[in-house]
Amino acid sequence: MAASQQDNHETRKGDITPEAYRQVLGRFPTGVTLVTGMDGDEPLAVVIGSFVSVSMEPSLVGFLIGADARTWPRIRAGGSFCANVLADDQVDLANAFFTRDGDPWEGTSWVPALSGSPMIPACVASIDCSVFDVMEAGDHSFVVGEVVDLKDHETGGSPLVFLGGSYGSFGPSVGSGS
């Protein structure tokens, strides 16, 4: 990188406001997952928009969670979690767990995954994991899970997508990704 470009980058770094950061990153679509776990007999869940594949060998996935998240420490203490990929017809489910109005589990059908974490068969897919590592990253933690089981629920639904503060779904292909 040329010195003038580097200087420009360093000068501009301090100009990034949380609002600008959120606006620009809001232009990037993300999937919506419901990361679940257990605390004794109590099912727990948190809505995640940062779920990502990390490694195929070993099979690792990850997500970011805010340092102020109240549910995550209870899920982490159990040593496992299940990432349920929400379908485009599950906006109400995402909102129920996001807003925490009433009991979000009421009317939500689930079965125990291999780890015991709640697996939601109405979702597009579920990825059951043991906690592999947790790294602090600014005001978030990056959670890495080792996949112990996974399930394509073959619901025929499309995954729920979040973009610019709104939910949507994945449209027809505009080209091959291969």
Which ranges hold each PLM region?
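Basic, polyanion-binding surface patches
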Residues: 2-178
